[in-house]
């Protein structure tokens, strides 16, 4: 709903005479205070900020001079006083407010520079419960909200990144309404995000997956040229979660990531993280959030080649994710193909030099792999609401696989089944994945019927075989995975026609017996996982 009027009755220009400074992040605060003092502004401060300013030789009053009350309870109570909040909330041209200020000796505060206890940082670092609670700021948010509400007369600054803009604004000693309003909006967003972090931390501490109120906060990391399509606006907000991935990775080279780049890179890195680097190098190639090819191999270079072989046509302009450090040999292979993004836990210096030959290629170092078993939440907006669920961190290695056919899978078939099911978990439903010897042979994604996904995957495999001069597609003797149950035997029969000899699926269809009978008729081994992996 649009706001009827975007302004309240207020003077456009307000002269800054008294400033209250209370910050945990002291970056730039001495320089700001010195500039304010140079303009004749009275400085008032609290605790550690007061000490820092006094140590810098600046004339600064302690907040107790405004309140007539000392800081008590280890600093828990120092600004929660009418002497402070009256100075922030008073309507300057209201006669009753002015009379109350005079009667109680309240000094008007024109500028508040405040940032908060580092709760988010302490939480991210895994602080214990008492330490984290102690870093919940009370007085800071109260002063910020009071100042922002009274932005008609008070300027609130909560971000050190805005100090230069503040100094530019007060070049003549005043701030204008538009600036105060902008800073007020930013201030309320800051306190909302802060409270969201606290609320979510308590929910985690109490193991409340779905609390009565769920607040999601984020900080704008970058404003994008456009969204999924050029006519859509977009921005990338980060939540502070320290899960290795596109939000925390370092961009070593290349252009700014687009909306689609970020979405696809996240999908690619989460997929490749299913494969533990200590077991084998792995590579996943993604296009439009679906894998084109996934493979493991004795070397990273070979894993890349095998992943590419699955569907080299679709891989053009794709995203490459690796589960180990990008080395020079693999980099030399990758630069042969147009690629949008590479993401890896780390990148060798030699590989960086090779990738630098493609200056537009975005290269990300994530600093590690996300733990596929770590719990967390995912969210999706719908009209009028927010769908929130726990992350799909079910792992096929943790499942008790049930052999439902007369023939049990061979050891190799079982390995291929598990590999295919891992990949199918990351393919848009309906998903069918053929795999053989640690390599995807064909991937069918996002079809409305499962049999069509099975057919498309087989067609992809045949095309790949022709492109690479193979006598037969890799689906011959492969295992096939379906991320949800096979509702009819037709999908299974399509996979058998493509050459699959083993099937892995959740099971649970009303026609399971029909599907099992078809598998037995063709001497195909089939196992049920009991776990579905829909992905939309």
Swiss-Prot record:
Transmembrane segments: none
GO molecular function, one term: IMP cyclohydrolase activity
Domain MGS-like: 8-158
Gene Ontology biological process terms from the UniProt entry: 'de novo' IMP biosynthetic process
EC number: 2.1.2.3, 3.5.4.10
Pathway linked to the protein: Purine metabolism; IMP biosynthesis via de novo pathway; 5-formamido-1-(5-phospho-D-ribosyl)imidazole-4-carboxamide from 5-amino-1-(5-phospho-D-ribosyl)imidazole-4-carboxamide (10-formyl THF route): step 1/1; Purine metabolism; IMP biosynthesis via de novo pathway; IMP from 5-formamido-1-(5-phospho-D-ribosyl)imidazole-4-carboxamide: step 1/1
Record bears the keyword Transferase: yes
GO cellular component: cytosol
Classification via Pfam families: AICARFT_IMPCHas, MGS
Catalytic activity: (6R)-10-formyltetrahydrofolate + 5-amino-1-(5-phospho-beta-D-ribosyl)imidazole-4-carboxamide = 5-formamido-1-(5-phospho-D-ribosyl)imidazole-4-carboxamide + (6S)-5,6,7,8-tetrahydrofolate; IMP + H2O = 5-formamido-1-(5-phospho-D-ribosyl)imidazole-4-carboxamide
Protein's UniProt keywords contain Cytoplasm: no
Keywords associated with the record: Hydrolase, Multifunctional enzyme, Purine biosynthesis, Transferase
InterPro entries associated with the record: AICAR_Tfase_dup_dom_sf, Cytidine_deaminase-like, MGS-like_dom, MGS-like_dom_sf, PurH-like
Record-stated family: Belongs to the PurH family.
PANTHER family: BIFUNCTIONAL PURINE BIOSYNTHESIS PROTEIN ATIC, BIFUNCTIONAL PURINE BIOSYNTHESIS PROTEIN PURH
Free-text note regarding domains: The IMP cyclohydrolase activity resides in the N-terminal region.
Protein name as it appears in the record: Bifunctional purine biosynthesis protein PurH
Gene encoding the protein: purH
């Amino acid at each position: 709903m649009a706001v009827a009027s975007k302004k309240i009755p207020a003077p456009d220009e307000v002269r800054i005479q008294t400033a209250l400074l209370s910050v945990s992040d002291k970056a730039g605060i001495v320089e700001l205070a010195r500039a304010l003092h140079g303009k004749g502004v009275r400085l008032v401060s609290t605790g550690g900020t007061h000490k820092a300013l006094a140590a810098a030789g600046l004339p600064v009053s302690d907040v107790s001079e405004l309140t007539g009350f000392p800081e008590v309870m280890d600093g828990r109570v120092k600004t929660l006083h009418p002497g402070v909040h009256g100075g922030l909330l008073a309507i300057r041209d209201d006669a009753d407010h002015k009379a109350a200020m005079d009667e109680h000796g309240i000094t008007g505060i024109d500028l508040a520079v405040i940032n908060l206890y580092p709760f988010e940082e302490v939480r991210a670092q895994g602080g214990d419960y008492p330490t984290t609670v102690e870093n919940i700021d009370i007085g800071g948010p109260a002063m910020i909200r009071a100042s922002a509400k009274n932005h008609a007369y008070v300027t609130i600054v909560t971000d050190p990144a805005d100090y230069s803009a503040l100094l530019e604004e007060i070049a003549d000693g005043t701030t204008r309404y538009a600036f105060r309003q902008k800073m007020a909006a930013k201030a309320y967003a800051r306190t909302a995000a802060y409270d969201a972090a606290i609320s979510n931390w308590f929910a985690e501490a109490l193991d409340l997956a779905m609390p009565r109120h769920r607040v999601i906060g984020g900080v704008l990391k970058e404003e994008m040229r456009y969204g999924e399509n050029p006519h859509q606006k977009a921005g990338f907000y980060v939540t502070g979660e320290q899960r290795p991935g596109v939000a925390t990775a370092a961009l070593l080279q290349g252009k700014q990531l687009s909306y689609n780049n970020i979405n696809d890179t996240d999908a690619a890195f989460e997929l490749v993280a299913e494969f533990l680097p200590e077991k084998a190098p792995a590579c996943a190639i993604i296009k439009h959030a679906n894998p084109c090819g996934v493979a493991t191999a004795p070397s990273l270079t070979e894993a890349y080649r095998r992943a590419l072989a699955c569907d080299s046509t679709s891989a053009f302009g794709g995203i490459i994710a690796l589960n180990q450090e990008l080395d020079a040999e693999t980099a030399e292979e990758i630069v042969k193909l147009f690629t949008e993004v590479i993401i890896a836990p780390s990148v060798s210096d030699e590989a960086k030099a090779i990738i630098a030959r493609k200056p537009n290629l975005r290269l990300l170092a994530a600093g590690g792999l996300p733990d596929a078993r770590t719990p967390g939440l995912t969210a999706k907006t719908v009209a009028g609401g927010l769908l929130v669920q726990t992350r799909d961190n079910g792992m096929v290695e943790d499942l008790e696989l049930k052999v439902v056919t007369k023939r049990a899978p061979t050891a190799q078939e079982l390995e291929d089944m598990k590999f295919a099911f891992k990949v199918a978990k990351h393919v848009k439903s309906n998903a069918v994945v053929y795999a053989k010897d640690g390599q995807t042979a064909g991937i069918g994604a996002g079809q409305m019927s499962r049999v069509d996904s099975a057919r498309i995957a087989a067609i992809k495999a045949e095309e790949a075989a022709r492109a690479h001069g193979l006598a037969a597609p890799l689906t011959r003797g492969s295992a096939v995975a379906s991320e949800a149950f096979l509702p009819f035997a037709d999908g299974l029969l399509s996979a058998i026609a493509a050459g699959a000899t083993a099937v892995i699926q959740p099971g649970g269809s009303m026609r399971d017996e029909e599907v099992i009978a078809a598998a037995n008729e063709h001497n195909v081994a089939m196992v049920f996982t009991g776990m579905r992996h829909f992905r939309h």
